[in-house]
Amino acid sequence: MGSVHGWIAWGGGLHGSDVEESEGMKKVRKVLEKAFSRKLYDSEVERIRTFEKELCLDTRVMIPFIFHGDRVVALPTTRYQDVDKSEKKYVEGVVMQLRRLVWRLMVWMHVPGGSSWIESLINEVFEATVSRDSDPVSLYKGARRRSGIRLMDLVMEVFKQNVSMVSEFGQRLARSAEDRMQGIPGSLSPEERKKEEEMLWKIKEHGERLCTKERQEEMVRAQKIICDVCAYVWEKDEDRMSFIMEVYSRHLCLKIVMPYTDIEVPLISYIDHHKLVSTDEKYKSVDIMAEVFKQAFIEHKGIDDESINNAVREVRERKRLEEMREMEERKRREEERAKNEEELLRMVEREEREKREKREKREESKGRGKRGAGEAKEESKEEDGKEEEGVEAEEEESAEVPLVETAVGGARRKKSLKGKRKGDGHHYKIHSRVLRWKRSAEKIKRELDKGSEERWKNRSIEEIKEQKKVHDIVEVSELIKSKECDRFFFRTGKYMKGGSERWKMVANGILEEGGEKKVGKVEVGLFKGERGESVVYHLMFRPTETERAGMVGGSSFGKGDDVDEIKKEESSDMSGFRYPPGVRCEMTSNGNEFRIEYRNPKNTSEVLRTLTILRIPEI
């Protein structure tokens, strides 16, 4: 969502796919340039042209979340009565649009050169049918049900209601495409006529497929799988944060492209329906479907045989590790139980021995005179007194010994029995491969050309300057070492690579430069140093469009990176880092945003670029 591809509008006629810039393209260009407050780059215009030439008949799915600003106001499992009172009217406004939104994603299609006749057909069928069905707001409120229904159930009800319109639309679409084949102008060249006929034939076949019960059931079932998986992923602690951050990232993209919308509609995403449904039928496992969904939605991978096999392996490996952990836990509990039984047996034996010794002493004292008995009694009291003094001394000694705990990064601090000392932040070291980006582009290039990382060699100065914009953000370290860190960054699972244990910290961010805003992730890559300290070896802002294209290391949330080997000795404490004199960088934080403004060293009133790191969405 939010990319140039996502906002190609319908317009103009079916003919004219070879025209330099169609009416539809002009419309899209105008919308995007207004949203970005700038002219589109040549590469972006070329992307629109490429997309305009593609016939796309893929049905979409809806991600059942409702955002309002930086808050999630409705989850898949949220009922109307559970919505915050201050957000109810807003949620009603979103729900009111569900019928039309679901309808458009069910019959979504893009035809090269524009297709106003298809757009008109979509609207005609909807307007003629929508009034027959119940109001989605009333349905969500659950007037007849005390508890109401969940948001995901509401989405499914709307899908089922809209299915009745799909057959009518498919029939009319197929007839219209056939009529247009008969009316292709004779002025077209044989090659143009062939292209037109092939395109219209595909549209006709698509319309006929929409009329089949199998295709309609596949639509509904695919959405049901998505709803169930979203709810399932949300309930898993280890997946919830990465999921909501990805949803929020796409939501931000949508807001930047369409900043003038009052209602923030749920996200629409493309996922191959046939692959989704067939995988569910084959494995019948919500764990596997959740993994497939995460790879497609969170890690920006398509659903193909390879990704499905990867998902199956991942789930099976996870279950194997869980079983091993359970076995180890059972073994630990059994060993603990055996140890406790052994200790209990020793205690019983000790008590029996003590009783026996006391009994023997009493019998011995009876054979002595009264004087001997009195001396034995005094001696026993003295021994008991010494034992009590020993216990008191032992307790005092243990109270004075402080406990030692290790802070993040290997720094050590004392902790008394009264409680942990407050105010301690996180401690990290910064690797030289991160610090190098604060140098000039020329120095960075010389260092990279001499370095061991092949992918960075022989880059042009222009490329280095572009990379410096997204890598020269070492000030982010001020946030990650602060107590506020966990409000902004999510920690991913650990993995092994190059002989080191690694993990990531990820936050949503917006990079502004020259009037352009880019939504993306702020990535912090870390590894465990030889002394146990945490070392930052990777730091960058990754634009969402780059992440989805599978460039530069893939997904922010994926377990992996493109750095093969790290020279562990090349790291330093970042506390002493300062930019050269004359360079000014301002950092501000209001609890919801951590903002870094990079200024012109020759004119500090001029802001060159701004990186804003956003708090994890409020739930």
From Swiss-Prot:
**Bias type Basic residues, positions:** 411-428
The cross-references to InterPro entries, in alphabetical order and at most eight, read: DUF3654 (IPR022115), UPF0329 (IPR011667)
The annotated regions of Basic and acidic residues compositional bias extend over: 350-384
Q: Where is the composition biased (Acidic residues)?
A: 385-399
Disordered: region residues: 350-428
| Family designation | Belongs to the UPF0329 family.
Protein name (record): UPF0329 protein ECU01_0100/ECU01_1510/ECU08_0030
From which organism does this entry originate? Encephalitozoon cuniculi (strain GB-M1)
